[in-house]
């Protein structure tokens, strides 16, 4: 999956350190990242940016490290000084331009995709907290931890992670596959949704399944989890057996998330996507017989 980057090691702890030329720069704008346009989706280095715009590096701030390679970003206002797209002798034959962060799902360089996605998550969070949500004062970065501090009222913000459940609903040798209605992902998926305030994971599983496909489930079992930076989420994967009638009733209240939900036999199940996501890792487990209904 996306986070499986061995032998590389992700270091999430905050470090107040100076960027080196071999470190990586994360430039984000909304849902876009500055990525190589050659299909590798690589990211520019500190050394490259230092040669064309040294002031940018002076304003950079630390995000995290993969092995000993640091990832850094810059405040939104600093982006205006960059001569975009990034091209020329400093970058060799590579041009860096704005591309969807979701492009990182398609690269074969796992640790680089992970670093870019997590970097986007954190850089986007910093961007959204430039001003205090309590008093409106411009915030500053903590020098001792990964946090945003208001110098006026003293309020402290930490990066947000939204909990999500994803459910492999099983009925004997069948699994329920869904297709989203509007989010741009056209391959099949599993029922999933955000956990509401005051809910347990298990309660969220039951609610999401009932809301989206009108089924009752039992034997809810935890499978595994995955950080999913693209939606600032931590996903908990579960399997569950149908409890009673397996007839699907799609939500049609006008805010429906799913375009379809179909039962697919294990023998005819086709793997449509890579195992970068927990969704397809769980579907593959069902295909291989690892994930089965409770006896």
Segments the model singles out, each with a brief description of its role:
Residues 144-190, 194, 216-217, 240-242:
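N-terminal strand-loop-strand
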Residues 1-108, 295:
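N-terminal alpha-helical interaction blocks
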Residues 137-140, 158:
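Short functional micro-motifs and their immediate structural scaffolds
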Residues 56-106, 195-293:
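Unchanged
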Residues 128-129, 136, 147:
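Residues immediately within or flanking Cys/His clusters that coordinate Zn2+
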